[in-house]
């Protein structure tokens, strides 16, 4: 039985915790602010994040069923950091990610990393040696419900774009980061045939041949592979993508926005297969790895280069850029 979601956290409490030294940057669009916080320095902001995450995920057909979506990875000395977009006009959170740098990953007794994804995926020795030190894990990406409808909220148009401004800045602050590791999420409510088409298409064009990361219990498609192969007959990604988009629309659906965004972010994205997240509304999680320097040039210019142009001094450091940005307040 689902618990009742907590009431909104008082905006004055939130503002009192979103202090200048936690601000990462301004967004390229909509004049919003990006902050990095943790449970340790911003406990009330974390509660509001948990509230908004649970609302957004329940609406889509997932969620924890608890009063707020917070788990053990959000707390503790080695907790995930929370990257959020803040609307200073409405004093509210637009969306966010949580992340953990590879250098901070801790290993269990079997040599596997203790991550939010560890119950679904097994990490190879090659991944742990050659990728982990240069990787940041991203998870729990969300856009607040009020910002998911572009018809009712003009800032919704750039909500995802704003979040990626934050991710772009991370690659400047942490120059050792070469890869983003995360998950694309699809929900049980999504039409099965459409899901199978999307997953087949992704595997065809982005499949990881090295088994760097593998799902412990891989999701089995309900549509036969021969039937899907007969639909996606092109070698070219763009040509096959047009087929996918047409077929999904014929079913009365759209490709989920985040899935669409990720597959159009980098031509060399690696796909690690799909597993069911049984503790999170049985959502279907597809592991992906994106090389930062192989993202499309347009994306690099918008989300990474714009941050360097605004703050060239950030290139001299690996963390704590706020100490430079706000030095006049020290």
Q: What annotation goes with each model-predicted range?
A:
Residues 1-3, 9, 26, 319-330:
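Long, low-complexity, charge-dense
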Residues 2-40:
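Conserved N-terminal entry element of GNAT/NAT acetyltransferase domains
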Residues 26-71, 75, 81-101:
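Short amphipathic alpha-helix that is part of the acyltransferase structural core
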Residues 38-41, 87-89, 98-103, 140-142, ...:
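Short, flexible loop/turn elements at secondary-structure junctions
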Residues 64, 68, 104-268:
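Acyl-donor binding region in acyl/amide transferases
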Residues 74-84, 107, 269-270, 280-286, ...:
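A short helix-loop-beta-strand connector motif used in the catalytic cores of GNAT acetyltransferases and
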Residues 257-264, 269-290:
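Aromatic sugar-binding interfaces of carbohydrate-active proteins
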Residues 284-330:
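C-terminal non-catalytic accessory extensions
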